[in-house]
């Protein structure tokens, strides 16, 4: 404004020179249109300059010299009059319009058979692995006590040959030899440590050692002999983890999928009292795919997974499972006055999409449950941009992990078909981006329950979307509301990468979640909601601020914020920010699918 007022006293010719100099120095680099005949010249006419108000008085076309003398600067813009080719908005025609999802994976083709170990184990082909421990001796020698129905292999596995190796957790060895039928077989072990009862973390280390051997060897058959004691839940967890870790996600590679990968066709398991474990096999396969389905959504980059394509994937899933579904668009959300949720998505080119799938069992419904997943398909932080070291902006495609867990649970529930329940799978999906339309720090927005919220930080967006989703869930008249979200990075500091935190307003419901945590082997720790911290959310101008005035206990304070949007319904909030992503393996865990499914199947009634 100051510069323009000075220029009005200059002659027109001098003013034009100053304007042109500014355009050349400040704006040309982002708006260069090359002449095909001469890459050093661009034609910048009045139409191009009209977007800069101080250039509107220029009366002629002007040829500018290319100031950087470099060939090829891509500049993409969206024309308001452009008609989109598909439901998913695109900047250029090459932009993806759907999320590639594998429904039939090689794991589904593996034939699994469970045998009783009392009859001895056969070593016929492929790889045979003994899971061994030595209670009380962490580095104790390997001793294989199972009967082996093969003389050559049995001779090799005698104590004098194996005692040079130890059972330290995760250690493994395998050897090639000929069996009695002169067939080449691989036989080995995985150490399970010194404890009699393995934890889920211990079992995962065992499985990872086993998967490494499978990936290193092209085999058609795997046989696992359990010389350790496991209950049914841990046995199922072994199978789920084996299937999940064995499967590789190569959807976005240009080469043929799994061109160098040959999956086994048969899995044999020897264990005591085999009949009690057989029923867990198919359930494990369902849990595996529910988790892998969620993982596929989380792993999909944000140019593939956006609010529209994610809602399309939810509809596709519902149709496959015969679930009821509806997707609410911006118009319906405006009618529901979801101002908090709508504000977060204002900066994105993709419209908000609210996912609502419903499973209704046949017969009497004893419990109605709403599962609510946070669904931010990419979180830039908004105007409070994730620019600081450690903000992990490159990983923010995973901020819809809660939504993915809920949809993965929908797959499991729709497949296993529990009785006497009605389940609502909900997610307020949007993208938190920076643009001229984005909501700003300091804005005051109104949620669907009428509460006004001062936006203290645009990077505290998840709680705003969940606020309206929780209000929506309670209006469904459900008995329980459980939300699951990558809500606060503080969970990494409080519980690390192994445990999720659970908060809530109902002790009975939280205990059900904790029990589901044990049976699903997805660890959850009960954290308190401390009401005296509510004062840190006070706002001078609105009913509440979306961020605390203190940096302390931010996960608890975030739960206090959510609590404001649930009135009379039992509610639990599960924060999975620390456990959703496997940082070492650089892939999603799909955390929460088994936890929520176990809750629905066994603990909700």
From Swiss-Prot:
Active site: 386, 463
Keywords of the record: Aminopeptidase, Cytoplasm, Dipeptidase, Hydrolase, Metal-binding, Protease, Zinc
pH-dependent activity: Optimum pH is 8.5. Active between pH 7 and 11. Optimum pH is 8 for the cleavage of the Cys-Gly dipeptide.
The protein's Enzyme Commission number: 3.4.11.1, 3.4.13.-
Catalytic activity: Release of an N-terminal amino acid, Xaa-|-Yaa-, in which Xaa is preferably Leu, but may be other amino acids including Pro although not Arg or Lys, and Yaa may be Pro. Amino acid amides and methyl esters are also readily hydrolyzed, but rates on arylamides are exceedingly low; L-cysteinylglycine + H2O = L-cysteine + glycine
Superkingdom assignment: Eukaryota
Annotated site residue numbers, Essential for hexamer stabilization: 386
Compartments it resides in: Cytoplasm
Cofactor annotation: Zn(2+)
Main location, first listed in the record: cytoplasm
GO-annotated molecular function: carboxypeptidase activity; identical protein binding; manganese ion binding; metal ion binding; metalloaminopeptidase activity; metallodipeptidase activity; peptidase activity; zinc ion binding
Acetylation as UniProt keyword: no
Disulfide bonds: none
Amino-acid positions noted as binding Zn(2+) 2 in the UniProt annotation, renumbered to this chain: 374, 379, 399, 461
Binding annotation for a peptide: 374, 379, 386, 399, 459
Effect of residue 461 to L: 6.5-fold reduction in catalytic efficiency in the presence of Co(2+); 854-fold reduction in catalytic efficiency in the presence of Mn(2+); substrate affinity is slightly reduced; impairs formation of stable homohexamer
Notes on activation and inhibition: Oligomerization is required for catalytic activity and is metal-dependent. The type of metal that binds the 2 metal binding sites influences catalytic activity and substrate specificity. In vitro, activated by Co(2+), Mn(2+), Ni(2+), Mg(2+) and Zn(2+) with decreasing strength. Occupancy of the site 2 is essential and sufficient for activating the enzyme but occupation of the 2 sites is necessary for full catalytic activity. Inhibited by fungal metabolite bestatin. Inhibited by Phe-Naphthyl (PNAP).
Positions of region (L13 loop): 384-401
Signal peptide (residue range): none
Membership in a protein family: Belongs to the peptidase M17 family.
Name of protein: Leucine aminopeptidase
Native species: Plasmodium falciparum (isolate 3D7)
